């Protein structure tokens, strides 16, 4: 594997993890949004990754294939005084799992940091290679 390929692979991972962090942040920001523009509670989103290898290559980077809505059911919270409550007093809340999103955020952040370290290591190796002939 050429060193320049490592830059492409790690760079694609940085982009993918950045998108994952953005989606998790959006989910956390909307965890208490009872209604959206369509009048329904916010639906949590998830990032779907896909291998991004050149044809015939054994290795490759990663890309975000899609951002999908979570199929988890909405949460029901008993608030009989809320104007959005149904006849039984329950309000439909977003299906965001706050703890799961925090774990997802930490995982994406660690993955991002690991890929930055990969880039720094490869850069250091290339600089040392250039000084071998001196």
Curated annotation (Swiss-Prot):
Belongs to the flagella basal body rod proteins family. Pfam families: Flg_bb_rod (PF00460), Flg_bbr_C (PF06429). GO terms for cellular component: bacterial-type flagellum; bacterial-type flagellum basal body, rod. It is found in: Bacterial flagellum basal body. PANTHER family: FLAGELLAR BASAL-BODY ROD PROTEIN FLGC, FLAGELLAR PROTEIN. The basal body constitutes a major portion of the flagellar organelle and consists of four rings (L,P,S, and M) mounted on a central rod. The rod consists of about 26 subunits of FlgG in the distal portion, and FlgB, FlgC and FlgF are thought to build up the proximal portion of the rod with about 6 subunits each. Keywords: Bacterial flagellum. InterPro entries: Flag_bb_rod_N, Flagellar_basal_body_rod_CS, Flg_bb/hook_C_dom, FlgC. This is Flagellar basal-body rod protein FlgC. GO terms for biological process: bacterial-type flagellum-dependent cell motility; bacterial-type flagellum-dependent swarming motility; chemotaxis. The keyword GTP-binding does not apply. NCBIfam families: FlgC. It comes from Escherichia coli (strain K12).
């Amino acid at each position: 594997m050429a060193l320049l390929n490592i830059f492409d692979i790690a760079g694609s991972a940085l982009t993918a993890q950045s998108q994952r962090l953005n989606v998790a942040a959006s989910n956390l920001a909307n965890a208490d949004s009872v209604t959206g523009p369509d009048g329904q509670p916010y639906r949590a989103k998830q990032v779907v990754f896909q291998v991004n290898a050149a044809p015939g290559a054994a290795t490759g980077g990663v890309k975000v294939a899609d951002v999908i809505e979570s199929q988890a059911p909405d949460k029901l919270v008993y608030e009989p005084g809320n104007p959005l409550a149904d006849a039984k007093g329950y309000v439909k809340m977003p299906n965001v799992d706050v703890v799961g999103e925090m774990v997802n955020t930490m995982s994406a952040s660690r993955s991002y940091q690991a890929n930055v370290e990969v880039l720094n290591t490869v850069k250091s190796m290339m600089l040392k290679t250039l000084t071998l002939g001196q």
